[in-house]
Design a protein with these regions (language model features):
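Periplasmic/extracytosolic POTRA-like scaffold domains at the N-termini of outer-membrane
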Residues: 19-64, 110-138, 176, 186, ...
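Short beta-strands and strand-coil junctions in structured, solvent-facing domains, enriched
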Residues: 67-68, 78, 87-91, 108-109, ...
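Short, well-structured beta-strand/strand-turn elements
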Residues: 61-77, 146
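Short, glycine-/polar-rich solvent-exposed loops and beta-turns at beta-strand/coil boundaries
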Residues: 71-77, 156, 200-201, 209
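Extracytoplasmic/luminal low-complexity segments enriched in Pro/Gly and acidic/polar residues
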Residues: 175-218
Length: 218
């Protein structure tokens, strides 16, 4: 039985990506394209004895967006590729140089060679110190379902304030620094639900959360 299993050829490749569809940097199409590049002629028709599953795993894990990969054959000859993707939090768009994603652990993932993930973009005065703050803010946004749904862009203005540009058009939410982010989010959510729901979300162009225990709007 073991010998017969070794003779089993790869009849099909199934790729499973452990990530929400809108946040997939790695897709089945991309994995199959890479396999065609790494292995001349592809893997369909190759026998299990001729293929190092560990080699396939290492190659897939060399992709910057991949955290972990597990590869195995089932008894029907299907090559199963399970990919655990890094979690993109924000796309950094610097004034100079190439844009990239920041994933959990502040891991940089080049845009080249990945699919497009629907995460907030960050731009403006992006010094190294400010990028660290953008990462912290993005982490808090990602973990808050309301803020995650609201946030379109994170902008660093000329004074060094962090500003969230929401999907509500023509509005800015001034966060300021990364101190007391949970409190600022809580104030904003209450303001939207108890205030703007009655007068309209587009009533104010600027919502300033910088100041403790108050919201300044204009």
């Amino acid at each position: 039985l073991k010998k017969d299993h070794k003779r089993q050829t790869c009849d099909k490749i199934v790729v499973l990506i452990d990530a929400e569809v809108e946040q997939q940097l790695v897709t089945e199409r991309l994995i199959n394209e890479r396999i065609s590049t790494w292995y001349v002629g592809g893997l369909i028709g190759i026998s299990q004895s001729e293929l190092s599953l560990e080699d396939v795993e290492h190659k897939i894990e060399s992709m910057p967006a991949v955290l972990n990969a597990e590869v195995s054959f089932d008894l029907r000859g299907t090559l199963l590729i399970a990919v655990e993707q890094r979690k993109p939090l924000v796309r950094i768009i610097p004034i100079y140089g190439e844009s990239y994603y920041l994933a959990s652990g502040m891991i940089k993932i080049p845009v080249t060679g990945t699919d497009v993930a629907r995460v907030p973009i960050a731009n403006g005065r992006l010094t190294n110190a400010m990028i660290k703050k953008v990462y912290t803010l993005s982490t808090y946004v990602h973990e808050n379902s309301f803020m995650k749904a609201l946030t379109e862009q994170i902008f660093v203005d000329n004074t060094g304030d962090l500003v969230i540009i929401p999907k509500v058009k023509n509005q800015r939410i001034v966060i300021g620094d990364i101190t007391e982010l949970e409190e600022k989010f809580s104030k904003l959510i209450d303001f939207y639900s108890e205030g703007l729901n009655h007068i309209g979300w587009d009533k104010y162009k600027i919502i300033n959360l910088k100041y403790k225990d108050q919201i300044v709007c204009r």
